[in-house]
Each structure stands twice: as C-alpha cells, then as structure tokens.
C-alpha cells in the first residue's frame, strides 16, 4: 500500500480546507497519515479520508509527503485565489471532491431543527458587534425559529451575553451535532467552515478578512460583506471597523435570507 503524509498545522478552517486533498489521495489508494491538530483531523479519520492522525512528525518513510507550512507549500497563496483551488493546482489534482462531509448526525443533537448562532472566531478582529446577532436572533425568533448559541473553547466571553447557549468543545462531537441543525449564522471562523462543509445553509460575516481566499467548502454558503474598497486588511485592522456596520450587515443578511426557501 502506498503511504502518504500530509502535514498542516493551523485552525479548524485551515485544516478543513485540506480535507479534499485527503479525499482525492484516498481515492488513489493511499494509506494516509496526517500531522497537525489531532482534534481536527479526527473528523477526516471518521469519514475515512485519513487512517492515522498524529500530532508530531513520525520518523518513517512515505511514498509522498505533502508539507503545508514554511518549509513546504506556502499555506497562503500569493494571489487572491481560493486556498483550496491553490492547493489542488499546486499538487496537480483534479477539482473533484465532495461538497459535503459524509458524516452521520448525532440523533440526540441539542441543535436538531434549530438555528445555530456563533458570534465568535479565532480573533476578536474578525467579530462584528454582538448586537448584529441579537438583531438576527430577534428577527428569527419573531418568525418562529428556535435559536441557540454555540459556545466553543474560544468563546467563553459569550456566556456573559447570552442565556440560550450550548457548550461543546470537541470538534468531531460538534460536527455530528451541527449536522442536524436547520442553518448556521457565524463569522469567518472554523465552525462556520465546518457548518458549510456539513451541508447546512451557512451565513458568514466577513469584515477585515478575504471571502475569496477563505471561502468554506459547501453548496449553501452565503458570504456577507459590505465590500469596502479598504477590505481585506487583516491582520492590520483599523479602529473604526466600518466594514462591520451592524445596520448594513443586517440588511444584507435579510436579503440573502429572504432569497432562500427555508
């Protein structure tokens, strides 16, 4: 059996954007070892796109090694292209991969049939004011939807602002639970990437980061941005954060939402 190693450290979103590579190589008959954040790559193992998940480089030979990092493939494309497209092109792989993670839903999910709101991300610079999510929650509740906030490990601050939350830290557990949610509203975060990849209609607010480069995988992704001429600017964001104007983003959300048959 041919052996392949894929190395990628980074956040959940960064890691998920390597999954189609694993899927393609699995289809070519490779036995696959991943090195990176094991909690994230466990999801790939669950869907059988990875055979072994490690946190450190093993001392052994591989028929093929894919290193995404400073001493391999640069994790960030020089041009303004979608990260996944950039990886597939560099590796000469076909643009054929699953749009949806083939993962089974948790039958006892606390999110079943509900709208999941996640006003957080890996950086406060990527979060619009939480008032935006309160407005969305009020609007959706008025239409009869049940909303619940997801509190992940980087989201402890949220608990001071909301009462209707579910706390969950394990990425694979979150993935199985999210699968049966109705739809998801979030920021440019790993959990938004996960939601989109699970096939949920996913609304994502982009301010200082680039929706072209950091688009999630999925068929029902609604990327919401005011498209200012000064965006994207991350990580050198300004104090004013005009790209996160609550009124404009809420209006934009409404337009996308009304265009959907939910």
Enumerate the language-model features and the residues they cover.
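Catalytic machinery of carbohydrate-active enzymes
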Residues: 1-262
């Amino acid at each position: 059996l041919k052996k392949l190693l894929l190395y990628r450290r980074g956040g959940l979103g960064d890691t998920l954007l390597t999954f189609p590579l694993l899927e393609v190589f699995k289809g070519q008959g490779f036995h696959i070892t991943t090195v990176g954040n094991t909690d994230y790559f466990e999801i790939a193992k669950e869907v059988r796109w990875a055979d072994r998940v490690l946190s450190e480089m093993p001392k052994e030979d591989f028929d093929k090694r894919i290193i995404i990092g400073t001493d391999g493939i640069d994790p960030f494309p020089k041009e303004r292209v979608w990260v996944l497209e950039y990886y597939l092109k560099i590796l000469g792989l076909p643009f054929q991969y699953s749009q949806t993670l083939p993962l089974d839903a948790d039958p006892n999910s606390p999110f079943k049939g509900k709208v999941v709101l996640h006003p957080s991300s890996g950086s406060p610079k990527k979060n619009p004011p939480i008032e935006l999510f309160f407005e969305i929650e009020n609007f959706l509740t008025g239409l009869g939807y049940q909303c619940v906030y997801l509190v992940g490990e980087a989201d402890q601050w949220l608990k001071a602002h909301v009462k209707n939350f579910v706390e969950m830290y394990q990425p694979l557990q979150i993935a199985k639970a999210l699968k049966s949610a109705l739809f998801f509203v979030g920021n440019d975060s790993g959990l938004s990437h996960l939601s989109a990849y699970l096939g949920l209609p996913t609304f994502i607010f982009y301010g200082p980061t680039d929706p072209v480069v950091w688009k999630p995988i999925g068929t029902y992704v609604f990327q919401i941005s005011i498209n200012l001429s000064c965006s994207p600017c991350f990580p050198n964001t300004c104090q004013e954060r005009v790209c996160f104007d609550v009124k404009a983003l809420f209006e934009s959300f409404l337009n996308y939402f009304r265009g959907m048959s939910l």
